[in-house]
């Protein structure tokens, strides 16, 4: 007949990896598996050995085995207490930084304290939490913007976090917040207009220099004559073939064979006084 574990309802669940054994845990005499105290049978697969009858739940605890070179944390602390903080030396045998360890317990604390509590310049021996000895100016002191006090008078990272490691100026500056980079004001306030751009006298629209008429919708006002000489028309006055004519409405220069202005939204007729010079009329006049 298989036995069923009678788990105590008041016992809190505990993971296997939460630390070492507890006092009331028991070892299976068959397979050597360590079982929680609430188990009545071994939970090892294919074992189910019942708990020994002589188990009184108060066996001596076994300290955890530490690797060589590691210092033991001392007496076993229950799950309710916080883990110890090693202030007097490195818990791994040798110091990690600069070959020197942190200040030991019960050492007079010199210099300004960054905390608002009065410790009477001495911390109690064996205290787990205490302010680290910090070399350098106290935090939030007056000074230059990027001086020894850090950014905006903030202490350097070694003072703020108590890392206990030496940092060069480059490393400390890398951990600081970078100031915002603002480009030159001239690049931000760059003028949107160019020297050769022109303003429409009718609607006030600013046009690019290459435009000959205003590009504002339903405007099409020609470029003022004072600025038209430098514009790049399809047919300039210098390169216009003989017999070309200028539109009286928009000022566009048209080829001789055109009878109407080819400017968009213009379509004005060719002036009558110049119609006789058109090549299309020449054959008819010669025929007569």
UniProtKB/Swiss-Prot annotation:
Record's compositionally biased regions (Polar residues): 1-11, 223-241
Entries under InterPro entries matching the protein: Znf_RanBP2, Znf_RanBP2_sf
Q: Where is this region: Disordered?
A: 1-24, 52-77, 176-198, 222-248, 265-288
User: Zinc finger (RanBP2-type) residue ranges?
Assistant: 22-53, 194-225, 241-272
Which intervals carry biased composition (Basic and acidic residues)? 15-24, 181-197
UniProt cross-references to Gene3D superfamilies, sorted A to Z:
Zinc finger, RanBP2-type
Cite the GO molecular-function annotations of the record.
mRNA binding; zinc ion binding
Signal peptide positions (record): none
Record Pfam families? Zn_ribbon_RanBP
Statement: the UniProt record of this protein carries the keyword Zinc-finger: yes
**Where Phosphoserine occurs along the chain?**
278
Keywords from UniProt, A to Z, are: Metal-binding, Phosphoprotein, Repeat, Zinc, Zinc-finger
The protein's matches in PANTHER family, at most eight in alphabetical order, are given as: ZINC FINGER RAN-BINDING DOMAIN-CONTAINING PROTEIN 2, ZINC FINGER RAN-BINDING DOMAIN-CONTAINING PROTEIN 2 ZRANB2-RELATED
Q: What is this protein called?
A: RanBP2-type zinc finger protein At1g67325
């Amino acid at each position: 007949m298989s036995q069923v574990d009678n788990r105590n309802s008041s016992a809190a669940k505990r993971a296997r990896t939460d630390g070492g054994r507890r006092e009331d845990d028991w070892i299976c005499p068959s397979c050597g598996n360590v079982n929680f105290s609430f188990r009545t049978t071994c939970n090892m697969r294919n074992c189910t050995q019942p708990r020994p009858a002589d188990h009184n739940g108060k066996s001596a605890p076994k300290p955890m085995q530490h690797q060589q070179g590691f210092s033991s944390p001392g007496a076993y602390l229950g799950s309710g207490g916080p883990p110890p903080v090693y202030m007097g030396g490195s818990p791994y045998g040798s110091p990690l930084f600069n070959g020197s360890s942190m200040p030991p317990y019960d050492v007079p604390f010199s210099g300004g304290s960054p905390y608002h509590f009065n410790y009477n310049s001495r911390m109690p021996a064996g205290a787990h939490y205490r302010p680290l000895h910090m070399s350098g100016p106290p935090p939030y002191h007056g000074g230059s913007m990027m001086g020894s006090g850090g950014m905006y008078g903030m202490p350097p990272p070694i003072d703020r976090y108590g890392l206990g490691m030496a940092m060069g100026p480059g490393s400390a500056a890398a951990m600081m917040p970078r100031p915002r980079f603002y480009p030159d004001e001239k690049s931000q306030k760059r003028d949107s207009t160019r020297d050769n751009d022109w303003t429409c006298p009718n609607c006030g629209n600013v046009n690019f220099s290459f435009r000959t008429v205003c590009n504002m919708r339903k405007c099409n006002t020609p470029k003022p004559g004072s600025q038209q000489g430098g514009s790049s028309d399809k047919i300039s006055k210098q390169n216009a073939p003989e017999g070309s004519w200028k539109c009286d409405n928009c000022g566009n220069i048209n080829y001789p064979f055109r009878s109407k202005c080819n400017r968009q939204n213009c379509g004005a007729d060719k002036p009558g006084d110049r119609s006789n010079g058109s090549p299309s009329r020449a054959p008819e006049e010669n025929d007569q």
